[in-house]
A protein has these predicted regions:
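N-terminal low-complexity segments that are often proline-rich with Ser/Thr-Pro
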Residues: 223-225
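PLP-dependent amino-acid enzyme catalytic core
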Residues: 1-217, 221
Length: 225
């Protein structure tokens, strides 16, 4: 199922994105003793993979939905991606950012056409506010990760990798909210079942790993309540 959805997303967004290079890193290969290849998403529009998900989500909406108002919450990359996608499709967007946001990242979002609203001390407070405003006004909130169309859009990285090499033993994917690894890992597992998918997070911001460690599976009795 995920492969067909990602393939559909790839067809939908192809004219709007860059197919980024997939290049061998001689330095990292030498350092690790493995053959290491890099998917150069830093060369994607807006400078990150986030644009894939944002433009796929926006293209999945109809005209009335787009014109109802586009809202996002971000500290930088997702906001820039939603802003550029909105600009391409000719609709305004509002991005909620925390008070301590980088001025350089704010300016980048403004350059792509975002209307910036400063709210709260962290991105989660901004996300809650953006969702609330979108719900109250009939607008659309564009999540950075928690949306199937975002996942399928970001999964197009894997669709490209599949066409750029004959196979991989292992792929290491950075993880924040989990949108990219859901799309990339799901797609590659469907075409190369034996591939090992490894999630990587910075030690000082390992929110996904901490969430998984805190999760407690419900008992059968709880499920019957």
């Amino acid at each position: 199922m995920i492969k067909s959805n990602v393939d559909n997303a790839a067809s939908r967004i192809r004219e709007h994105i860059r197919q980024t290079p997939f290049e061998k890193s001689e330095l990292i290969s030498k350092m690790t003793g493995a053959e290491v290849w890099l998917k150069m998403e830093n060369q994607q529009f807006t400078g990150s993979f986030k644009f894939r998900g944002a433009i796929n989500k926006m293209l999945s909406l109809n005209d009335a939905q787009r014109k109802s108002g586009i809202y996002a919450a971000s500290t930088g990359n997702h906001g820039a991606a939603v802003a550029l996608a909105s600009k391409i499709l000719g609709v305004p967007c509002i991005v909620y950012v925390p008070e301590n946001s980088s001025e350089a990242k704010l300016e980048n979002m403004r350059n792509f056409g975002a209307d910036i609203k400063v709210f709260g001390s962290d991105c989660m407070e901004g996300e809650i506010e953006a969702r609330k405003v979108a719900d109250n006004t009939g607008g659309i909130y564009v999540s950075p990760y928690n949306d199937p169309e975002i996942v399928f859009g970001q999964g197009t990285i894997a669709e490209e990798i599949h066409s750029q090499c004959d196979g991989l033993d292992t792929i290491i994917v950075s993880v924040g909210g989990g949108g990219m690894i859901s799309g990339v890992g799901g797609y590659l597992k469907s075409v190369w079942p034996d591939i090992e998918v490894i999630a990587a997070s910075p030690e000082n911001h390992a929110v996904m790993i901490k969430s998984c460690l805190l999760y407690t599976s419900p008992s059968p009795r709880d499920l019957l309540k």
